[in-house]
From Swiss-Prot:
Gene this chain is encoded by: pyrH
Name of the protein in question: Uridylate kinase
Keywords assigned: ATP-binding, Cytoplasm, Kinase, Nucleotide-binding, Pyrimidine biosynthesis, Transferase
GO cellular component: cytoplasm
Family statement: Belongs to the UMP kinase family.
Pathway note: Pyrimidine metabolism; CTP biosynthesis via de novo pathway; UDP from UMP (UMPK route): step 1/1
Intracellular or extracellular location(s): Cytoplasm
Record: residues binding ATP: 9-12, 52, 56, 159, 165, 168
Residues binding UMP, per UniProt: 51, 71, 132-139
Amino acid sequence: MTYKRVLLKLSGEALMGDKPYGIDPAIVQSIAEDVERVIANKVQLAIVVGGGNIFRGLKGSADGMDRATADYVGMLATVMNAISLQDGLERVGVETRVQTAIEMQEIAEPYIRRRAMRHLEKGRVVVFGGGCGNPFFTTDTTAALRAAEINAEVVMKATKVDGVYDRDPNKFKEAKKYSSLTYQQVLSDEIAVMDSTAIALCKDNNIPIMVFDIFKKGNISRAVAGESIGSLIS
């Protein structure tokens, strides 16, 4: 089953590649080429991008910053990533619009739901930056919110691991990978795949979540085509 309208969540860390900080142009190009294949198959694609490769609000708060202030700095980091992603996508011929929850008229459109949906209908990729515009909400929650708003069929969380595990596979060799699990299981067992607000929002709106490895070339188009390449939460 090929999905028709997809919300792709890219973590900021995914854009780092093997770098300790910032954006790896090779990773952006690889993502852009994969997205180009998705768009060529007439799939409508919106992207929410994180900012953890540049600044993470929770860490800033832990280091002594006011939490709301730290979150706003994190939102600005997501806009930097969104513009970089737009550049990469347009280099491979994918028409792209950036919409931000905090107005920055010189560099991006403001987030307007109906306009975003119209862009999708015209075959453009829409990259959402600036989180949801409010502190105390993660970009995972933004992904769930935007998916509900644009009537996406699925949230695809592209990350550093190849699915959902019962514990950190980088720390525990015996970690068990789930091929599928329920929203309630994630919430009850406090499985660290997305924050509870994001999971609950997807649960309330019956939007499945697919978690897969972004670093394996071609995985975005495989996920959109419905291949079982990661873990499915529903």
